[in-house]
């Protein structure tokens, strides 16, 4: 059993067309009521909407967050060749951009987890208000420096007194 082959092919489009016709009729009635009440200004059909497809998908950030600036002060920037002379076992490439490290390149050496990254790669990561290693998620700020970091961040925020003076109500 079942439906005849042509039944669904005709039924669904016909139902769709009837639904659209009913919606069009309701629209006409609503517009007529608005015109009758003198509210036709609210029915501007000439309204042009901005074309958001021509805008860039993301507006680039122009400033770094305070926390990123403070973390940059904490994390050392050194040349890669200085680390190679120290005799430590170092990765061959940056885990963010996957380019190899070269002797004169500036890198940031994370104190907590000992990972290294190109300076520009890690700075871009911090500009997005990230406060952990991109590889292992260990916090950038060592535990022994966390209190000092929080105080400097509080001072940089511009809020000098969090607590309001208590006044009596009459």
Swiss-Prot record:
Keywords: Brassinosteroid signaling pathway, Developmental protein, Membrane, Metal-binding, Transmembrane, Transmembrane helix, Zinc, Zinc-finger. It comes from the Eukaryota. Induction: Repressed by brassinosteroids (BRs) such as brassinolide and 24-epi-brassinolide in a BRI1-dependent manner. Induced rapidly but transiently induced by chitin, a fungal pathogen elicitor. InterPro entries: Znf_RING (IPR001841), Znf_RING-CH (IPR011016), Znf_RING/FYVE/PHD (IPR013083). The keyword Transmembrane applies. Disruption phenotype: Vigorous plants with thick inflorescence stems and enlarged leaves; more rounded tip in rosette leaves and more serrated cauline leaves. Highly expressed in stems, rosette leaves and siliques, and moderately expressed in roots, cauline leaves and flower. Detected at low levels in seeds. It is found in: Membrane. It is a single-pass membrane protein. Signal peptide: none annotated. The chain crosses the membrane at residues 15-37. A zinc finger (RING-type) spans 94-137. PROSITE patterns: ZF_RING_2 (PS50089). One of its GO terms (cellular component) is membrane. One of its GO terms (biological process) is regulation of plant organ morphogenesis. Disulfide bonds: none annotated. May be involved in the brassinosteroids (BRs) signaling pathway and regulate the growth and development of rosette leaves. Seems to prevent over development of leaves and inflorescence stems. PANTHER family: BRASSINOSTEROID-RESPONSIVE RING PROTEIN 1 (PTHR45969:SF10), RING ZINC FINGER PROTEIN-RELATED (PTHR45969). This is Brassinosteroid-responsive RING protein 1.
